[in-house]
């Protein structure tokens, strides 16, 4: 048991964090990264640190000229997707730290969320970098984001689960049910269950956001890159996509741990919320399909149209469902990628670029091979 009754920035009690649940355990004390309950979160932290990059490393000199050659339909596709991605990363640039970290009770997940939020901030800076280099007046994009009805309509479903959890958590924190004398009362048990249920929904929402909602925009950016247009922007989006894959994996492991032995109450909630999660997926796919129609209302890009994008969204959603132990419910089978050419953009190893020309996406910072044996270099001669 901990003597801490409430929240603290530094817990002076001795707590074995290898035996704690991911959330709602005792407050954290010493940040130590030598032993873990869930080593995968430290691995994901190391990956993100190794992938660290800055948007200024990618040249956008050609993109400004390319943008001027686009027709009206293509400019609509490019600009609308930028606006939507700015919305998503504005949410994720503060969401994990604002909503999840205050209730995190293992250091490896806390550290993972710290770098997660930092990388999302870099994504937001990247959109500013693109806009400042491509558009003569950046305000034409930024100032119109909150005037776009299509963007605002999607913002509500993207942020609702976050906001619901934040409001429930605030009410719980300002009440008395978390105090030692009240914790075991029926009302307190209901309140903590409701709090955990809202956390589950918020994390599921983030998994869908990171794993599905970005991908229509990604595919459009890569389609321009395939046509040798706006290649600098496409490379930046490729770097962002690589990061988002890591962030999706964080939320995926949180959800899967709850289905196992992390927290018995969360395991029950996961079972009870299964149909709700399916409905969240259905809503996201429906909204992304409508977004694809809106993007291509004036015309398509060579190699890409709204119908192909809609199949791609379904294919992606089925993959995400399977990764959290749920069944595929959409028509496009996992075995048939409708946009196979996107694969090399989403895989940093598939990007073949000259180092002097652009950012090398497969380059890792601080990556060291530690399993070298005494005979590893036996075949080498000087």
Q: Where are the regions that the model predicts?
A:
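Non-heme di-metal
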Residues: 2-382
């Amino acid at each position: 048991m901990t003597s801490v009754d409430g929240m603290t920035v530094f817990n002076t009690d001795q707590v074995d964090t290898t035996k704690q649940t991911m959330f709602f355990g005792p407050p954290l004390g010493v940040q130590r990264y030598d032993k873990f309950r869930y080593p995968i979160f430290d691995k994901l932290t190391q990956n993100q640190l190794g992938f660290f990059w800055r948007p200024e490393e990618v040249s956008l000199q050609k993109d400004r000229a390319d943008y001027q050659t686009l027709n009206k339909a293509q400019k609509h596709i490019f600009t609308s997707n930028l606006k939507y991605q700015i919305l998503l990363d504005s949410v994720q640039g503060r969401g994990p730290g604002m909503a999840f970290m205050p209730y995190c009770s293992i250091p490896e997940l806390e550290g993972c969320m710290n770098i997660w939020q930092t990388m999302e901030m870099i994504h937001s800076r990247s959109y500013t970098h693109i806009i400042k280099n491509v558009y003569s007046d950046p305000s034409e994009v930024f100032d119109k984001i909150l005037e776009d009805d299509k963007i605002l309509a999607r913002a509500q479903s993207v942020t609702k689960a976050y906001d619901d959890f934040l409001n429930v958590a605030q009410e719980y924190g300002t009440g008395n049910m978390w105090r030692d004398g009240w914790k075991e009362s029926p009302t307190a048990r209901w309140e903590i269950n409701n709090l955990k249920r809202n956390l589950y929904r918020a994390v599921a929402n983030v998994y869908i956001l990171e794993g599905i909602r970005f991908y229509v925009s990604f595919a459009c950016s890569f389609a321009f890159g395939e046509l040798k247009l706006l290649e600098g922007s496409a490379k930046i989006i490729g770097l962002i996509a690589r990061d988002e894959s890591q962030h999706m994996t964080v939320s995926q492991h949180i959800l899967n741990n709850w289905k196992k032995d992390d927290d018995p109450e969360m395991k029950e909630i996961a079972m009870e919320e299964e149909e709700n999660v399916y409905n969240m997926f259905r809503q996201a796919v429906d909204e992304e399909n409508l977004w694809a129609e809106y993007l291509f209302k004036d015309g398509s890009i060579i190699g890409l149209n709204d119908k192909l994008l809609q199949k791609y969204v379904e294919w992606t959603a089925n993959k995400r469902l399977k990764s959290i132990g749920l069944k595929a419910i959409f028509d496009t089978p996992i075995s048939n990628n409708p946009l196979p050419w996107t694969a090399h953009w989403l895989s940093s190893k598939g990007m073949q670029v000259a180092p002097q020309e652009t950012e090398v996406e497969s380059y890792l910072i601080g990556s060291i091979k530690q399993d070298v044996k005494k005979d590893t270099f036996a075949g080498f001669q000087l």
